[in-house]
């Protein structure tokens, strides 16, 4: 008998003032997998991610994470981390302060914060940049700070919304490899939104093809 999926979206729907956001979204995600939601702008992939994150609540359907019904749970109660297209860094804080900000909010002891930060900076290749502000970093370095912040959160589920779209083509290829290696090394489950077919095909174990607010096809890169 196979293990239960780590994440389940069961017939989820979202509408705004009667307008369709997503409809009939049903998806099982295995623990430790890398799942890409792929499709053009407006297809519902970011809405699906926001529903999973708890940033929006569905009008219909259920959402489960680790077997727990989180359909109406706040984002802070879903045990996940997020990496955004905009990086969402605090410009007045240093790299180190940005990385451990969430840990400070959660009142994690200082020694533990420092240990987790050192490990995250090592993994993301940011050692030596601890005191720099985001404005002093390249786009690729800023994205690595956002990744380091997700790593120190220590969550087993990480949601990524078009995290590479602000980078140039050469950097995208480099950071793409970094993200995939991190996911494998840490054994985390990643749900990754992108409109870039190459990105999805090169990173994901499973691709969810979306159009007009609905899932069109689900399969491995080879199957699609």
Where are these regions (language model features)?
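The feature captures the beta-strand-to-loop junction immediately N-terminal to the Walker
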Residues: 38-40
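Conserved ABC ATPase signature
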Residues: 133-137, 141-143
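A short, proline-enriched helix->beta-strand linker immediately N-terminal to the Walker B motif
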Residues: 152-156
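ABC ATPase "signature
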Residues: 218-219
């Amino acid at each position: 008998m196979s293990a239960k999926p780590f994440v389940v979206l069961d017939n989820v729907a979202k509408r705004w003032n009667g307008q369709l956001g997503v409809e009939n979204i049903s998806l099982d995600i295995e623990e430790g997998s890398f799942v890409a939601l792929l499709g053009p702008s407006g297809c519902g992939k970011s809405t699906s991610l926001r529903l999973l994150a708890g940033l929006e609540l569905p009008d219909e359907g259920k959402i489960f994470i680790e077997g727990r019904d989180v359909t109406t749970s706040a984002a802070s109660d879903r045990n996940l981390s997020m990496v955004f297209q905009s990086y969402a860094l605090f410009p007045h804080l240093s790299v180190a302060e940005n990385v451990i900000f969430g840990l400070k909010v959660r009142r994690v002891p200082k020694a533990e914060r420092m240990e987790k930060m050192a490990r995250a900076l090592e993994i993301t290749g940011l050692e030596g940049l601890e005191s720099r502000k985001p404005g002093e970093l390249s786009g690729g370095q800023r994205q690595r700070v956002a990744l380091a912040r997700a790593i120190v959160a220590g969550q087993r589920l990480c949601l990524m919304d078009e995290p590479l779209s602000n980078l140039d083509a050469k950097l995208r290829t480099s950071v793409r490899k970094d993200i995939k290696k991190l996911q494998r090394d840490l054994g985390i489950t990643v749900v990754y939104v992108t409109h870039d077919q190459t990105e999805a095909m090169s990173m994901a174990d499973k691709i969810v093809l979306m159009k007009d607010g609905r899932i069109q096809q689900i399969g491995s890169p080879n199957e699609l």
